[in-house]
Every structure is written in structure tokens, then in C-alpha cells.
């Protein structure tokens, strides 16, 4: 369904088994003053089938020939285990009568259809599109600057963390560590991970370097999350961490050391919660003690007053 307030459209594909090169279409939706729909299809690349998503302008034949609209769109394939594992791709494109659709590929279809991955649950796949109109100008002419600008996100944050495409200088500076291409800034922590836990990625069969880089980022995020102060962990954070660990284990990663840390953090969190409860109980008891003490003093005073000699009665006797 479409939401014109936040410019989002959610597409739930039911009875999803796989997609073919022939696209399937979402319902039409209205955002930014125009009707759109989403196309999902498969595309073969490097011997693998990838899921591709396109945003397509509907009824553009009725628009003026000089019509242009620059649009930024992001597609998110929702992970039902944890939002942090959701996959997102973003692009910017100048739509016109001739260029009515644009999109990109997200990840291997085999990973999408793997029931252990968290993307396919009860035969359903959920896709969220967010569309922002950046410019509308009939005098605007298409240029290379407004061809597609691809930006990929790795999904490791409650709000997805942007992972910008590497430029040539970045790629030239990449360092290979145990088959993972990492930036020099990541080298220290990656080396420490594999030195202390050499079994971590021995059974990871994925050869695609982009996917391997995203998996390393998942591990980074888990470390950052689990090594925070005990009081900084929310129940939601720990649930996400548990889902992320289960996902990584299904991919072949040996992360017993992180699972152990997660168990420790969960135990500490339970103790923190117990301490909070005990402090509240103590506070309530102290308040009750104060109230009872005041009531006791009042009762004693009333008894004392009631027991005092009645002079008028004594005079009579």
C-alpha cells in the first residue's frame, strides 16, 4: 500500500518461490503526483541469478514530451528476523517519456529463497519503496550527471547504515585478509578477529566480494553493539543481535565467541533489571515504613490522650 505522507509503498509478494526473467508487477500507487509500480525479475550475472527491482512510471504517454522528473528511490527487502539484516539499494534517476523505468540488482536469489535467511517467511517477501521527488522541470535536459547514481546500504543499524560505493582510490587501497577485501581503517579489527578466532570464516562459501564485505560489516556491528555498557542494551537490540547471529551461522560463520558474549550481556541485563526491581521494591518499602511509623505515632498519641486523667470526673469521686 502507498503512503503519500512518508512517500513509501509496501509490496508484499505472496506465494513467492522464485522470479523469472519475465517481470512481475506490483499494484499501481500514487506518489509525487504520478502513478508508479514496481517490477521484480531475475537477471543472470557472473553465473548467478540476482533479484532485480525497477521503479516504473505509469501512463507516461499522456505526459508532455518535455516533461522531466528527477527522483530518488530506495528499495528495501525486509528481513523478518531482524531489520538490521534487511537489504537496501538506492538510486537517483531523471524520468521522462523515453526513460520511464530504472532499478538495480540486490542479491542472489538463492539467498532470498533460503528459508533460513529471514527474507522469505510463510511464502511471502516484503519490499518497501521510498520515493522522493528532487526536481521537476520541463526545461530540464538529461545529462550524464543525472544518470543513475547507485548507492548501497548494508542494513546494519536500526536505521540502515549508508555504505557508499568505493571510488578508485579506495579500491586500490583495499587489503586482502583471509579472502575478505577490507579498507585500511578496518584492517586492525579484522586482523584481531582472525588472530583470536581463526575458525570464524572457514566455512563461508560465498565468493562475491560485495557480499563478503557486508558480512564483515555485520560482525563489526555485532561487536559494537555487544561491547557497549550493560545499561545501554535494549531488549530490541539484543533480539536483533540474536537474529543476526543466527543468520550469520546459517551462512557458515563460526561465531561462538560472539554468542558467548551475547549470553553474558543478556545475563547482565537480567541482573540490571533485577537490581532495578529491587531498588523499586526497597523504595516502596521505605515509603511504607515511613507511613506506618507516622500512623504508629498517631495511634500512640491518641491512646495517650485517651488515658489522661479526667479532672472533672476525679472531682466528682
From Swiss-Prot:
Membrane-traversing stretches: none
Coiled coil: 254-305
Taxonomic superkingdom: Eukaryota
MATH domain boundaries: 6-131
Keywords of this entry: Coiled coil
UniProt cross-references to Pfam families, sorted A to Z: MATH_2 (PF22486)
Alphabetical list of PANTHER family matching this protein: TRAF-LIKE SUPERFAMILY PROTEIN (PTHR46236), UBIQUITIN-SPECIFIC PROTEASE FAMILY C19-RELATED PROTEIN (PTHR46236:SF9)
Protein name (record): MATH domain and coiled-coil domain-containing protein At3g58240
Native source species: Arabidopsis thaliana (Mouse-ear cress)
